[in-house]
């Protein structure tokens, strides 16, 4: 789980984890794709019966607009989601130049007790007003991977009390709604596995409740050859019948012998067979400060071909 840090220009860093070119999809480029239909879920960002495919883009030596243009040329399509990371006290954006793409903001958390107790309400209100001014429907992922021990807002670093996270999340939700940020869809997004992996730190302990969550997210990377099913099925099984699922961070590293292309093919197949997944966001960067890994999907011609095949398939035309 890389964690990009502050502001959209800062590089995040992938989530902590435990540890051959894909075939053409049926009807790939020439496919006549009917319009996607809404599923009735997702709040301000409605889930469709097709997958929205997007990315966190931080390509070395390129601006966001240059990176978007490169991916447009390579894939023959737009990013449906553009993911950015913003610090807890940073001034949130009220406008972003990403065309028709849906903005996803991962908003860093902070120590939980002051948030839960109201001492950080002014920060929350300022963020709510800025994002309300954005006006367009967008996704907000606050204090992600709370079931891990690598962030200051993680439950294990806050008295091992998941209830503090739940209270803080609900408070933020209420303040956003009170300040007119009705365009903001709330994403609750644990890591695929918990650290420590104990019953007291189980991801479900941190769930704020259906009334406070529009989408359920999950972070999971191919660090140790885990399959997409291994990474995402626990969240899909627990929440997929109630909320649309967004894979908020994922990517593969190259283990050799075409492994990245093969894994992308497996990701495509898993998502195509999992109707509750409504969005997938690739962690598309080669400048991760705390990692030697290159998460770009164009590190080889076969990996690019596999990703292009996925991006052009009907299931990913949301």
Would you name each region that the model predicts?
Residues 79, 203-226, 283:
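Aromatic- and acid-rich polysaccharide-binding/catalytic face
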Residues 42-123, 252, 281-282:
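N-terminal substrate-binding region of glycoside hydrolase catalytic domains
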């Amino acid at each position: 789980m890389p964690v990009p840090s502050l502001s959209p220009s800062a590089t995040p860093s992938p989530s902590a984890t435990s540890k051959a070119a894909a075939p053409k999809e049926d009807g790939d480029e020439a496919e006549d794709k009917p319009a996607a239909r809404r599923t009735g879920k997702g709040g301000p960002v409605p889930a469709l019966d097709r997958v929205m495919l997007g990315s966190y883009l931080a390509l070395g030596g390129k601006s966001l607009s240059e990176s978007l243009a490169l991916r447009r040329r390579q894939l023959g399509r737009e990013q449906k989601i553009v993911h950015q990371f913003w610090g807890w006290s940073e001034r949130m954006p009220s406008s972003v130049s990403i065309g028709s793409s849906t903005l996803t903001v991962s908003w860093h958390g902070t120590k939980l007790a002051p948030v839960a107790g109201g001492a950080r309400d002014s920060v929350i209100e300022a963020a709510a007003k800025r994002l309300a001014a954005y006006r367009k429907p967008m996704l907000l992922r606050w204090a992600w991977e709370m079931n891990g021990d690598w962030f200051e807002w993680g439950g294990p670093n806050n008295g091992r009390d998941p209830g503090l996270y739940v209270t803080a999340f609900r408070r933020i939700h209420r303040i956003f709604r009170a300040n007119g940020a009705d365009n903001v869809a709330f994403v609750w997004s644990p890591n695929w596995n918990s650290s420590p992996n104990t019953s007291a730190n189980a991801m479900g302990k941190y769930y704020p409740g259906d009334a406070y969550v529009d989408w359920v997210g999950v972070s999971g990377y191919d660090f140790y050859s885990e399959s997409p099913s291994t990474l995402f099925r626990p969240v899909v099984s627990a929440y997929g019948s109630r909320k649309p699922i967004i894979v908020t961070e994922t990517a593969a590293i190259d283990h050799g012998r075409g492994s990245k292309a093969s894994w992308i093919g497996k990701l495509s197949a898993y998502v195509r067979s999992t109707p509750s997944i409504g969005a997938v966001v690739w962690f598309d960067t080669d400048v991760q400060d705390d990692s030697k890994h290159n998460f770009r999907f164009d590190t080889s011609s076969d990996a690019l071909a596999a990703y292009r095949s996925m991006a052009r398939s009907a299931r990913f035309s949301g």
